[in-house]
Structures are given as structure tokens and as C-alpha cells.
From Swiss-Prot:
Organism, scientific name: Clostridium perfringens (strain 13 / Type A)
SUPFAM superfamilies from the UniProt entry: NagB/RpiA/CoA transferase-like
Biological role stated in the UniProt entry: Catalyzes the reversible isomerization-deamination of glucosamine 6-phosphate (GlcN6P) to form fructose 6-phosphate (Fru6P) and ammonium ion.
InterPro entries with a match to the protein in the record: Glc/Gal-6P_isomerase, Glucosamine6P_isomerase, Glucosamine6P_isomerase_CS, NagB/RpiA_transferase-like
Residues annotated as the enzyme's active site: D67 (proton acceptor), N136 (for ring-opening step), H138 (proton acceptor), E143 (for ring-opening step)
GO cellular-component term (any): cytoplasm
PROSITE patterns cross-referenced by the UniProt entry: GLC_GALNAC_ISOMERASE
Protein name: Glucosamine-6-phosphate deaminase
Entry superkingdom: Bacteria
Species lineage: Bacteria, Bacillati, Bacillota, Clostridia, Eubacteriales
Pfam families: Glucosamine_iso
Hydrolase as UniProt keyword: yes
Keywords: Carbohydrate metabolism, Hydrolase
Pathway(s) per entry: Amino-sugar metabolism; N-acetylneuraminate degradation; D-fructose 6-phosphate from N-acetylneuraminate: step 5/5
One GO biological process term: N-acetylneuraminate catabolic process
Amino acid sequence: MRLIVTKNYEEMSKVAAKEMAEDIKRNPEIVLGLATGGTPVGMYKELIRMYNEGELDFSKVTSINLDEYVGLSGDHDQSYRYFMNTNLFNHINIDKNNTFVPNGLAENVEEECMAYDSRIQDMGGIDLQLLGLGANGHIGFNEPGEALSVGTHLTDLKESTIEANARFFDSIDDVPRKAITMGLGGIMKAKKIMVIASGEGKAEVVKAMMSGKITTEIPATMLQMHRDVILIVDEDAAKLLK
């Protein structure tokens, strides 16, 4: 696991964007696994800047997102499809037909999950998977538990995750309780994984991810078993690392 510690959130975002940009330039037909949440927003802004300045071409890129809330349509302003469109896709030249997010309104969730895994397989797998870290160690919506699912699946969100995401909704009661998420198996099959984390609130989980015991109670620790992980954090998130 490679570790890069940056001064602050802004620098972390720039370093992460540069890392992804280099991979896109090396492989214009790259399959990117993308994430949502507060952490990658700065990185996406930097990628948009690079595109606007002629440094990046997304026309042949395929993207596949980690997760989506169950019960929200893609045009709901808190859905992850909406998040990706407004924070990245609408501002670059990616073909929207080559951007994939689970369908939160799927009538048959089990079929949707199986189809999502088949799609990833048909693409030849994910070349670069971007991950944020939940304060409780979740990656995607793979929450702490006795067992972790391999494939894309329906999951019940932990109370701590619901509380953390409540800031995006009018009320905590509006936060969906279920989500479709890629499983640990799909994430671990990615050829390369880039993890980004910022702020003191992520320091404990960053420490556990780097050197803690591998346990399903902290899903991020599973990344220790992957052959190519780069962890990009700011000083606050790295403060418990020796």
C-alpha cells in the first residue's frame, strides 16, 4: 500500500486528480470505478479543470459507480446518479451511455444486482477504483458486520451512516434506509484502488486500514490484501500514523 500525505483537503484533491488523470492518459478506454460523498468533490472539480484546459479527454472512458440509494430515482437531487451528473459528468465529454450507477428504482433488486456484476465482468473489470472511507470503516455501502458480501447486493444502512448522510437531506427521516452497493469481491477485483480521506474524523479508520487487524468489523482493513492500493490523505486524516 502506497501512502501519500498531503497538507490539506485541497492538495489531497489535486494529487488524487493527477493520479487518476495519468491513468486516463495511459489508457484512454479505462474503466473507472467512481465514488460519491463529500470527499471526492474537490477531486472531481480538479478533473473538470483539467478537461476544460485541454489536458484530459473522457470520450472513451467508461465509469461504474459503487452504490445507489434504494427508492430514489436518478433525477432525485440526493441520488448518486444526480450527484455524479452535477459534480462531474455534465462538465466533461464522457458519453453518459458509458456511465453506470445502480438503479435505485429497480423492481427486482436481486436481478439488478446480478446484472450490475455481469456488466462489470463484460467490461473486463475495473481498472481504477476510487474509494472514500466511512468513519466506521465502510467502503461503498459495505457496512461493518459478521460477514461481507462478495457481489453487488442490497444492504441495510447502519445508523451511523444514516446520521452521517442526514446533512444532505431536509430531515434524517428522509434518508433512505437501504442501498444497492458493489460488494467487497467486486471492489477487490479492481486492478488498482485509490483511497482518499480527509479530516480528523477519518484518522482512526485510516490507521486501521493501514496497519490494523483485518476484520469484517472494519471493511476497509480488507484493502490490505489488495496488490495495488494508493492511499491519499491530508495531515488531519494521517495524524495517528507513525
